[in-house]
A protein has these predicted regions:
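Class II aminoacyl-tRNA synthetase catalytic cores and aaRS-like
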Residues: 1-587
Length: 587
């Protein structure tokens, strides 16, 4: 028999009754019932119940052990009997009568309970992450991640893509976030950067003649944490394709995402095909370029209805309306709570009206609406008895943000929100440029390296604020999973695009010398995308925080509490790297 086990703790069934077995694992739980000791033994594969009777060496040995100690046991598989079957366990029809026990690793008193979600704070969990990962939910999340990545590789290969590695030590990149830098010992005063993404390398692979690339790529950005973004390190499925237009990128990625979410989504419905929603339309209808389409409500732009209005709350402002069916009969509390929610987002309040049975409007602002206002609102919003309408007014970006969040909250409160579904969409036609309101300068709106729609002619003849880029995002349930673009592979178009944003030719030639040089040696039209692995797993696991799907994440302050990183370097090491440290003075 094997030194440690003949079977795993998730393997034994009723057909194994009478078999002598050897198991190894962790002492998950213990119960003493009528003098008989019951132990749940856990390993990677599952749980098996052990039984030890008083007066036996096995009882004495197991009785002394602490939870989470590792043991090897020898014993015989016996039936639990029909009345004692545990239907929640695959091994629930049997138990193992223990004959021999060997302690493999004793556990100290635990800092928190492993076999229950007891509300321990995240900092404690991250300090003892090796214990936290023993919890069933965390173990399930990490194995889900493993399975998803394995499936990604298989499906991408089946779609004709080739997995290739790109460098980890590289030069600083123009993605926009802060780099993590690595000092060079051999080249004093010079630094490598950890890649924010393999963007330039995957484009260079296309220029090198490799047609379809993918990589499960580690990316490093020195940026603050959010619920859907872990600081420091994250992983994405980087993809690049040659001789493609936008729809050529969409087709394999949409197929991949649909199959992944159908396979690992726990039976939740996946909406396919994914609708294509232009950026401007998304901002107007949903108040966001990351719309949660589970909310079955839409905003309507009614700015024109109130142009020249004497109602000061709306006059001269961008006005958005949110019609909500079947809520007019709700109590005043319903409306007040939604107004309070809007205030938490920065609104001064939330105007609203009800639609009465006769079609008239009632509510706090009804008296400020003219007959023409009412007629236009009724027609534009397709109002009917039982509707209520909520209004937001202000600057475009401000009212979009507030009313976009109100849209989702109202849908949840009013029963117009879908559950158990993954609603995907593509956001397309992003503006190439935007104007800084303070300086009046034109700058890139999103990705400066995407191809402008209309090419060089558009750059030379159109108002920059009217130019759209071949840029696109995948959004699912209000979470941005990926950004991508058809790349700007022509040097003259790239130089002109940067000129419009205020960069002279010499600066661009110097800053992006490597890419421009490569583009001048026969670059193919190419495009790509990079879905975030961590966010995909977060959605599939139905977790609110991305750190719940990463084995060893940094905390919100970019610290590894378990390993003690970041650490200080010894003086000798600093000298070797030609560095000195100046700490900020305390304020």
């Amino acid at each position: 028999m094997h030194r440690y086990r003949s079977h795993t703790c998730g393997e034994l069934r009723a057909s194994d009754v009478g078999t002598d077995v050897r198991l190894s694992g962790w002492l998950h739980n213990r119960r003493d019932l009528g003098g008989i000791l019951f132990i749940d033994l856990r390993d990677h594969y599952g749980i098996t119940q052990l039984v030890a009777r008083p007066g036996t060496p096995a009882y004495d040995a197991l009785d002394k052990l602490t939870k989470e100690s590792t043991v090897r046991i020898d014993g015989k598989v016996v039936s639990r009997g029909a009345e004692n079957v545990n239907a929640d366990l695959p091994t629930g029809e049997i138990e193992v009568e223990v004959g021999e026990v060997e302690l493999l690793g004793a556990a100290q008193p635990l800092p928190f309970t492993i076999n229950a979600e007891d509300g321990v704070n995240e900092e404690r969990r991250l300090e003892y992450r090796f214990l936290d990962l023993r919890r069933e939910r965390m173990h399930r999340n990490i194995m889900l991640r493993t399975s998803v990545i394995s499936a990604m590789r298989h499906k991408m290969t089946a779609l004709g893509f080739n997995e290739m590695a790109t460098p980890i030590l590289s030069a600083t990149s123009p993605e926009g976030a802060r780099d993590f830098v690595v000092p060079s010992r051999l080249h004093a005063g010079r630094f490598y950067a950890l890649p924010q993404a393999p963007q330039q390398f995957k484009q260079l692979l296309m220029i090198s003649g490799f047609d379809r690339y993918f990589q499960i790529a580690p990316c490093f950005r020195d940026e603050d944490a959010r619920a859907d973004r872990s600081p420091g390190e994250f992983y994405q499925l980087d993809v690049e394709m040659s001789f493609v237009e936008q729809e050529d990128v969409f087709q394999p990625i949409e197929k991949l995402m649909t199959e992944l979410f159908e396979e690992f989504g726990g039976g939740r419905h996946v909406t396919s095909p994914f609708p294509r929603i232009p950026f401007r339309e998304s901002m107007l209808k949903y108040g966001s370029d990351k719309p949660d389409l589970r909310a079955q409500l839409e905003l309507t732009d009614i700015t024109d209805i109130f142009e020249g209005s004497e109602f000061k709350a709306f006059a001269g402002k961008h006005v958005r309306a949110l019609p909500v069916p079947d809520v007019a009969a709700q109590s005043r509390k319903f409306f007040d709570q939604l107004g309070d929610f809007a205030v938490t987002l920065g609104a001064k309040g939330l105007a609203w009206v009800r639609v009465a049975e006769d079609g008239s409007l009632t509510g706090p602002i009804a008296k400020f609406l003219t007959e023409q206002n009412v007629a236009e609102l009724t027609k534009r919003l397709s109002l009917a008895a039982g509707h209520a309408v909520f209004f937001g007014a202000g600057e475009f970006d401000e009212v979009s943000k507030i009313m976009g969040a109100v849209r989702v909250e109202a849908a949840k409160r009013a029963g117009h929100f879908e559950e158990n579904v993954f609603r995907f969409c593509w956001i397309v036609d992003f503006p190439m440029y935007e104007k800084d309101e303070e300086s009046g300068k034109i700058d890139f709106s999103h990705n400066p390296f995407s191809m402008p729609q209309g090419g060089l002619e558009a750059l030379e003849t159109q108002d920059p604020l009217d130019i759209l880029g071949w840029q696109y995002d995948i959004v699912c349930n209000g979470v941005e999973l990926s950004s991508g673009a058809i790349r700007n592979h022509e040097p003259e178009i790239m130089l002109k695009a940067f000129e419009i944003a205020g960069y002279d030719r010499e600066t661009v030639e110097e800053k992006f010398a490597g890419m421009l040089r490569a583009f001048r040696f026969g670059a193919p039209p190419h495009g790509g995308i990079a879905p975030g692995v961590d966010r995909i797993v977060m959605l599939l696991a139905d977790e609110p925080n991305i750190r719940e799907t990463i084995a060893f994440p940094l905390n919100g302050n970019a610290q590894d509490l378990m390993m003690g990183a970041p650490t200080e370097l010894e003086e000798a090491r600093l000298r070797e790297l030609h560095l000195s440290v100046r700490k900020p003075q305390p304020k």
